[in-house]
């Protein structure tokens, strides 16, 4: 019997180890990781092509940072929920991310349980809304 997929996800982080860790966490909980990117420009391309349910988006990346990419992702894939994942959790960054349309923020270093709890909360809120 096939497992029920909870959501499709694109993982965006310039650190390949972080992407691998996030993919392991997500796949272990029946999320389908359909794409990944190492910078904001590639993230936009992935989101436009794949229209994921959820995007895990780092802030500090080369070529285009996550805050710039966030606005473009909402243009090319307006139904995608974006959860920011960053070590840069100053109040200014969090406020800017939320203002630009992020649904939440998870601070690095990551704990699997906190990432999954935040994702589940966001997805449940989307279903109710």
Q: What label would you give each PLM region?
A:
Residues 16-35:
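Two-component/phosphorelay signaling modules centered on CheY-like receiver
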Residues 39-42, 65-68:
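Acidic catalytic/metal-coordinating carboxylates
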Residues 50-56:
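Active-site beta3 strand of CheY-like receiver
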Residues 61:
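Receiver (REC) domain active-site loop signature in two-component systems and cognate sites
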Residues 88-89:
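Short, conserved "switch-loop" micro-motifs in signal-transduction and mechanochemical regulators
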Residues 92, 110-120:
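C-terminal output helix
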């Amino acid at each position: 019997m096939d497992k029920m997929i909870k959501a499709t996800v694109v993982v965006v982080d310039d650190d390949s180890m972080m992407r691998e860790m996030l993919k392991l966490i997500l796949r272990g909980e029946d999320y389908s990781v359909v794409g990944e990117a190492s910078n904001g420009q590639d993230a936009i391309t992935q989101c436009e092509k794949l229209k994921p349910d959820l995007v895990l988006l780092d802030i500090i990346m080369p070529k285009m940072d996550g805050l710039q990419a966030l606005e473009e992702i909402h243009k090319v894939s307006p139904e995608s929920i974006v959860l920011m994942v960053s070590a840069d959790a100053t109040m200014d960054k969090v406020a800017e991310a939320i203002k630009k349309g992020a649904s939440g923020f998870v601070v690095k270093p990551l704990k699997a349980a906190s990432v999954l709890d935040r994702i589940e909360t966001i997805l449940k809120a989307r279903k109710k809304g």
